[in-house]
Amino acid sequence: MSIFASILRSVYKLSGAKKKFALPEDALRKEIEKQNRHRGVFTPTDRKAYYETIMVNGFPCLIVRAHPKPAERAILYFFGGGMVIGPDRGDLPVMRKLCRETGCDVWFPFYPLCMEHCISETYAMVYECYRKMITLYGGGNVSTCGFSSGGALALGIAAHNNAQPEPLPQPRHIVVVSPGEVPWNDAEKVRMQALNKRDVSIDYAFMVTVEKIMRHGCENVPDYMLSGSRGDFTGVGDIHFFYSADEVLYGALPYFEEACKRANVPYTVSARPKMVHSYCMLPIFKEAKEDFAKIVDILKK
């Protein structure tokens, strides 16, 4: 493990960030509201890329391009935050890097969060983004990518698409970093709990508590919107998973693998020990740079 990765892991331990994810629901909601005061929709003002913001189902979607005209291919890229915490400007350098190094436009939806919306509303917005992208770029030219809960949405697009009466073409590639998942069977819960002591970022308790928040009072929520490994990924070109081998969400991997096998979709897995949650999307240290480069190689094919 590199020195920077070791320091980052120590910083997470000392910060007490994990403890916040173990708070009871009321206290957790207050903490989320506090964090969201400094997060949310942003409009880039730099000249490092070409930016456009469109409205989709009443919510903004930022489009990042390397050139004034649309590229031939695009990535639908999702921020993480447990479906409850909004993005910040720290996501922008990663978007520009993806855009520049893959040759793809990057679409970044500011999707509705489950503090105020049911997860089904989130899916309605991001799926409409996907529909617009298929119309513009054509089938086979759109991939999805995301980290944490954004990884769940990147996978969920495919499952949601297969649940439609008239599905669109599936994503060319799906790349996910530490995808979120509400555990849905006893074995998965045991696996996640066993990893909890080794995870310095996310507490297992959050993966249980967040289900109620995601439902937002709605009972008829499809299983795949809460637990992505229950979805049908049939038709996807390929799926690529990146994890820390020492995080709670790594416990869900066997069930995602089973879902890929059921759907006959090729998949790969990369799991590095001692990394923090979603480390790949902070490509400023050795391990993250190496794995981000792998992500770029996948998405530019």
Where are these regions (language model features)?
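A glycine/proline-hinged amphipathic helix-loop "lid/cap" segment
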Residues: 1-67, 236
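Alpha/beta-hydrolase superfamily serine-hydrolase fold, recognizing
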Residues: 18, 52, 56-62, 68-301
